[in-house]
Amino acid sequence: LAELPPCDGVTSVRFYGAGCGETFPEASEKLRRELEAHFETTDITVESDLLGAARALWGRGEGIACILGTGSNSCLCRDGEILKNVPPLGYVLGDEGSGAALGRNLVNGIFKGHIPLKEEFLAAHGLNYEEIIRRVYREPYANRFLASFAPFIRAHIDSPEIRELVLRSFRDFASRNLSRYPAELPVSLLGGV
């Protein structure tokens, strides 16, 4: 953002992003100030990615909005507002159904011998056991690293072990998140997963 030149003619900015909104007021205010420096308007709102998803999926309607991407999240929304949110808890404690959870379970299954694709997986990513452990425990953004294995999962979805991994992850998302909302409401999802 700092490298962008100022932009004229913009009357308002609505930004929806992960790590923004009411839950993260300091980060939201910092981003709002940075946006204000590039757009000649003070009509700038910074909100959560979940609120953006809810508004995109349901507008002024009512339903359950879900994000399945690097992480996962869900909410009950009505009239463009979030009424209830089951906390996602991040990739270590939650994020069921997310790319990070799928990647974590893939690596676990491969190295514990439950998924018979070890050599193909390591060759496809130019990795070894030590490198994976280093990237997960000693470098930032382990969630993104784990989520980067989602295309491998997609490419091998016909493998019974991979198919079961995916189904189990989505069942976990439903049982730990969707089950906390009224069952009669419709559910919509978006995201890279």
What residue ranges belong to the model's regions?
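ATP-binding/phosphotransfer module of carbohydrate and carboxylate kinases, centering on a glycine-rich
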Residues: L1-R14, A37, T42, L57-I64, ...
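A glycine- and small-aliphatic-rich helix-loop capping segment at beta-alpha/alpha-beta transitions
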Residues: K30-H38, R60-I64, D79-K84
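Short loop/edge segments at beta-strand edges and connector loops
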Residues: V46-S48
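Glycine-rich phosphate-binding loop plus the immediately following alpha-helix
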Residues: I82-G126
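Metabolite-binding pocket within alpha/beta catalytic cores that recognizes anionic/polar moieties
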Residues: G52
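Short beta-strand scaffold segments in enzyme catalytic cores
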Residues: R55, C66, S72-C77
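Metal-dependent catalytic neighborhoods of phosphoester/phosphodiester hydrolases
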Residues: E22-K30
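Short glycine-rich anion-binding loops that position phosphate/pyrophosphate groups of nucleotides
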Residues: A18-G21, T70-N73
